[in-house]
């Protein structure tokens, strides 16, 4: 994921959105893993 062709064109919201998506992905993965292990 090194698409640093135009770093000045990237807004600050993109970093925040990717951070939120990463947290959501970790949360969903944790819920799926816990439900899989507790089954």
Swiss-Prot record:
Purpose of the protein: One of the components of the core complex of photosystem II (PSII). PSII is a light-driven water:plastoquinone oxidoreductase that uses light energy to abstract electrons from H(2)O, generating O(2) and a proton gradient subsequently used for ATP formation. It consists of a core antenna complex that captures photons, and an electron transfer chain that converts photonic excitation into a charge separation. This subunit is found at the monomer-monomer interface and is required for correct PSII assembly and/or dimerization.
The keyword Membrane is annotated on this UniProt entry: yes
GO CC terms: photosystem II reaction center; plasma membrane-derived thylakoid membrane
Protein's gene: psbL
GO process terms (BP): photosynthesis
Subunit annotation: PSII is composed of 1 copy each of membrane proteins PsbA, PsbB, PsbC, PsbD, PsbE, PsbF, PsbH, PsbI, PsbJ, PsbK, PsbL, PsbM, PsbT, PsbX, PsbY, PsbZ, Psb30/Ycf12, peripheral proteins PsbO, CyanoQ (PsbQ), PsbU, PsbV and a large number of cofactors. It forms dimeric complexes.
Principal subcellular localization: membrane
Family designation: Belongs to the PsbL family.
Pfam (any one): PsbL
Source domain of life: Bacteria
Protein's organism: Synechococcus sp. (strain CC9902)
Localization terms from the record: Cellular thylakoid membrane
Coiled-coil segments: none
Topological type in the membrane: Single-pass membrane protein
Key words, A-Z: Membrane, Photosynthesis, Photosystem II, Reaction center, Thylakoid, Transmembrane, Transmembrane helix
Protein name per Swiss-Prot or TrEMBL: Photosystem II reaction center protein L
Residues spanning the membrane: 18-38
């Amino acid at each position: 994921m090194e698409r640093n062709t135009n770093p000045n064109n990237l807004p600050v919201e993109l970093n925040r959105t990717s951070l939120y998506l990463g947290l959501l992905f970790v949360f969903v993965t944790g819920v799926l893993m816990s439900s899989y292990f507790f089954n």
